[in-house]
């Protein structure tokens, strides 16, 4: 999956490593106390998310990775999200902690949107550092979304639909870029074909529906169903 392939396939390497590391994470989650999990998450947030995001911003402004010498090899990368999901499942946020989580998530979303608007205008820099998936702002938003999902009541229909969608997610991940390329690069559909907000919604739903359909078809093929 190297070379001239879909740009989204880089994440397959991460998925493979996460699956390899899953037994180790299971040991941690089965035997660690709440305080130990909190310690691991704090280490991850400081040395992976915050340090990584600072390094990303430094690189965008032409500096070396200013914290490269001070980042120890600890729980890093997407593995921290594994632990965060387990922690929030085992110890759901309540009361003031939940409200603070939502406030920080809203502020983070504002920082992400504001940064994407202000940085190009002020410094002439187009950067993805502000919304980096392994960054503090994205983590706060993800944690809030996870917390919200824990408090949603699901109907009987939803309990049937969600497992079906869950089984199709990997196929959707693999195929959605094909439909994006088909839409914008082969059919040359312009992003401004209608009102921008509506265009984003229509395009997103269309790509998702097409990818879901193809993923479902692939799941019916014996050779492919093992993978999707």
Each predicted region: which residue ranges?
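Alpha-helical transmembrane segments and their immediate juxtamembrane cytosolic regions
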Residues: 1-228
